[in-house]
UniProtKB/Swiss-Prot annotation:
Its cofactor is Mg(2+). CDP binds at G190, D195, G214, G314, F319. The gene is PGK. (2R)-3-phosphoglycerate binds at V1, D2, F3, N4, R17, S40, H41, G43, R44, L98, R99, H146, R147. This is Phosphoglycerate kinase. The lineage of its organism: Eukaryota, Sar, Alveolata, Ciliophora, Intramacronucleata. It comes from Paramecium primaurelia.
């Protein structure tokens, strides 16, 4: 399941993802299973235990929505998890955050913040332990289904099925992507080009226009026009494939939109000073682009206003911080307006879904 929900002041802020899993869970419980064990991510603890990312906080809301008790297990592997998986009477177990183990993603950070990788043998052992916790694998975590994580690709069961939420999401996306109303616009954000290379390539075969914003835009700007990006996010791996993406966009006659002005700060926190920079000035050393400026916001709104089908994956900036949220919020407002004008608007990706929920716009978009 995908219980990677936004938390504020020790409480679940938005229950959409938990609610989404309930139909599948209720259907499973109707079959009188010996027990049900739930796995999920929470936050980005980078392969180590971080208490603020514990899934324990989800239990009260899950119990309320299911109308039954949920047993929280303090680790996703080990003796406690194995013991819980052998319980009877239809017991529901929620395992602790999979991402507390480096073997889930295959990489993480050590205590000093240095990048580390999990060795193959430990990943193999981790996957075997997860597999031992059940007989049938149900994937209802659409938001993480694209990731090659152990819980997604490493569960060794003969019976592996999609849950109701997964099916609903896939059916909706298939219809929208196979027979879209045109013009068709895709909006991409997030940090790394390399993480979304397959998505970018496949969308270039389908769309008429593409907005590239957020952190990944700086990799494009540095490569494409040698723009000075200061200490903005830069994806070295993605840098190598920018030319290929731009060439394919030209071949397919897809118009690419990149930001033209930026709200910048010296750090990713609320105490950071704020400065405005554009393509002429560049971003100075020591500063990083953290949001789209007003000109970019207007250009994005114009592109959204032309589109009849819009897919949005990735915010335009560090929207969690007050002074860097306007680019993402203005984009959301433009999508809400275009939905009212009859466009089909689809939002995906954890951060973007959280942004929509935080601005109480879940029911103002198509999906």
């Amino acid at each position: 399941v995908d219980f990677n929900v936004p938390i504020k002041e020790g409480k679940v802020k938005n229950t959409t993802r938990i609610q989404g899993a309930i139909p599948t869970l209720k259907k499973i419980l109707e079959q009188n299973p010996k027990n049900v064990t739930l796995m999920s991510h929470m936050g980005r603890p980078d392969g180590k235990r971080v208490e603020k990312d514990s899934l324990k906080i989800v239990v009260p809301k899950l119990e309320e929505l299911l109308g039954t008790k949920v047993n929280f297990v303090n680790d996703c592997v080990g003796s406690e998890a194995l013991e819980a998986s052998n319980a009877g009477n239809g017991q529901i177990n929620l395992l602790e955050n999979l991402r507390f183990h480096i073997q889930e993603e295959g990489k993480g950070l050590d205590a000093n913040g240095a990048k580390i990788k999990a060795d193959k043998e430990s990943v193999k052992k981790f996957r075997k332990e997860l597999s031992s916790l059940g007989d049938i694998y149900v994937n209802d975590a659409f938001g993480t289904a694209h990731r090659a994580h152990s819980s997604m690709v490493g569960i060794d069961h003969k019976i592996r099925v999609a849950g109701y939420l997964m099916k609903k999401e896939l059916d909706y996306f298939a219809k929208a992507l196979e027979t879209p109303q045109r013009p068709f616009l895709v909006i991409l954000g997030g940090a790394k080009v390399a993480d979304k290379i397959q998505l970018i390539k496949s969308m270039l075969d389908k769309v008429d226009e593409m907005i590239i914003g957020g952190g990944m835009a700086f990799t494009f700007l540095k490569k494409y026009i040698m723009f000075p990006i200061g200490k903005s996010l830069f994806d070295e791996e993605g840098y190598k494939i920018v030319d290929e993406i731009i060439a394919k966009a030209k071949e397919k006659n897809v118009k690419i939109h990149l930001p033209t002005d930026f709200v910048c700060g010296t750090g990713l926190d609320a105490s950071s000073p704020v400065a405005l920079h554009d393509l002429k000035s560049g971003i100075p050393d020591g500063w990083l682009g953290l949001d789209a400026g007003q000109l970019t916001q207007r250009e994005n709104a114009d592109a959204i206003g032309r589109a009849k089908t819009i897919v949005w994956n990735g915010p335009q900036g560090a929207f969690e911080i007050e002074q860097f949220k306007n680019g993402s919020v203005s984009m959301l407002n433009a999508l809400v307006k275009q939905t009212q004008n009859g466009a089909t608007t689809i939002v995906g990706g954890g951060d973007t879904v959280n942004l929509v929920g935080a601005n109480k716009a879940n029911d103002k978009l198509s999906h």
